């Protein structure tokens, strides 16, 4: 285990909760930071706080409500439908979200004496979001180091994992049932298996079904 301190960018969803469990295995001290960016489902923040409390992780919520003013999107405005037109990004994409989240997380981490930042971005199942790409994360890592003259390391443990592989990692961390029943991924604000209809729920369910099927096949041999 690395005895250094890490900050996890934390939403209370499947991916960031998996990253929180991962970070607790990897680092001597872990904190979680959640951003209030005007998301229409405020329950996300409550879920993040509840999970952090249960895991004994210090949790901070930072106000980034200006993001909803700058970049209208389906995650902050109920009058914008969750959809994806051919050749376009989904309406759930928030311009600059990960750029701002990671930049503010870096400032927060430096003030806490932490070099390590953990985020659940993933290029394998990223819905075309440009700020989930590995090249962006590597570029931002260099920029943050130059901007603050500080040796940050941004960790992306899910970057090259499919959703099924993310569930496998959760299982290996001993957290599958916890993540399955206590996290909030659903765009409609429903904990655990969610609404079953939005893109986030569909991706989550497809990955879980695939992993459980593969696990059952291995165990039956």
Curated annotation (Swiss-Prot):
Annotated keywords: ATP-binding, Ligase, Metal-binding, Nucleotide-binding, Queuosine biosynthesis, Zinc
Binding-site residues for ATP, renumbered to this chain: 10-20
Binding site for Zn(2+): 186, 195, 198, 201
CDD domains from the UniProt entry: QueC-like (cd01995)
Catalysed reactions, as listed in the record: 7-carboxy-7-deazaguanine + NH4(+) + ATP = 7-cyano-7-deazaguanine + ADP + phosphate + H2O + H(+)
Pathway: Purine metabolism; 7-cyano-7-deazaguanine biosynthesis
Signal peptide: none
EC id: 6.3.4.20
Family: Belongs to the QueC family.
Protein name per Swiss-Prot or TrEMBL: 7-cyano-7-deazaguanine synthase
Organism: Geobacillus kaustophilus (strain HTA426)
